[in-house]
Every structure is written in C-alpha cells, then in structure tokens.
C-alpha cells in the first residue's frame, strides 16, 4: 500500500501488479460506496494476475482512512448510523476532487518501474461509475478505456462539474454495463445517456445484463449473479487488450 500525498492529505492506495515482466498497463479501480475491502482487493488481484498494474484508492481519505460498510446490513436498524456515514462519505466527493486524486496516482505510478507509461484503463462500479466516465474526459490523452457498471448520475446538469461536461474531449473507448433490475438506473436515464453519447460522437457501448440486479459483479453481495459477473470480466479484459 502507498500513502499518496495530495493537497488534502494522504490517500491510502492499494497497488497490485505481477512480480515479473513489467512494466504493466495501469488500471485504476475506483471503489464503490461501501469502501475499500477485501472483496475489492480480490477483484484487483484478478486484474493484476492478467498483467496489469492496478491502483485501488481509498476515495474517502479526506474523511477517514478506513471505511468498510456491509451491504447485507443496509436495512438493519442497528446499522443505520453506519449507513448515514456512508452517504456522507459519498456526498463528500466530486469529479473535481477525483480528478485531483487521479492526477496524484498517475504521478506516483510514473516513478514506479512496474507501471506502464502508456494508455490507462479506469473502471467504476455504482458510486464510482460516474467518476470513471468523468476521468475519461478529464484525462483524454491517458485514458484508453473506461468502464462503468450499474452507475448513475452520468448526466447531472445541476452540477458544475457533471461527468458529461467533458465528454467531447473523450478519445478512449467507453463501456456501460447496466443491470436489468436497478432502482438507481431507470430506462429513461439509460436512453438519455445513449442519445447523449451518440450526439457527442463518443465511442461507447451500452449493454444490459438480463436477470441481473444492482451489484451483480460483487461476489460478496446477495445480488451476485455469476453469469453476469463473468461477462463483466470478459468485457473488461477484452476492452483492455484492445486499448492498453
């Protein structure tokens, strides 16, 4: 783990990569709202084992060095305080802040001989899907592939730094994977995104995952759907092979 210095403090970031045959293309894995946990570390290890230099930052470092929420207890009254804390953490973030953090991660990686110097991949699930989208536009010369799964609020006109505002700068390939059943991603929202991407000539694919629910890719979730999770991995690795 590395403590990456930013203007707001130290961002504790887990780094995974193969021991041999570097340098390896960089993939930034932006966490979801429950925070950095072993489940995400294992997903990053899977990516690293395929030949990538993976960075998993604690995006809530401005508020806490460690936050781990158990999604299965989200409706437990005894867990209400923890749930409230999670939403406070989520609301503390913005595309501008995540861009600052991404810049700091890339600066650190530039000094690591194990990290590649070319195009990078970014991936976000749920909360961080919008940040993966935003970073593709903020760092168009670095992000070769950006993927998001069951995210929301990609187009938020009321926000001065909404993810969609930098879409015209995107040069890399985009992928959006949505669950068939997801209260956070309505059909209308997905269609609005589809039209927006086409109108702005963004190279993107939007795919629906039948029978899947929000959170399907996470093995520790009740919503885990094996077939959809494996398809999600197939799409990620295929896109990275083409672009990184």
Language-model regions: role of each:
Residues 1-244:
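N-terminal cap/leader regions of alpha/beta-hydrolase-fold enzymes
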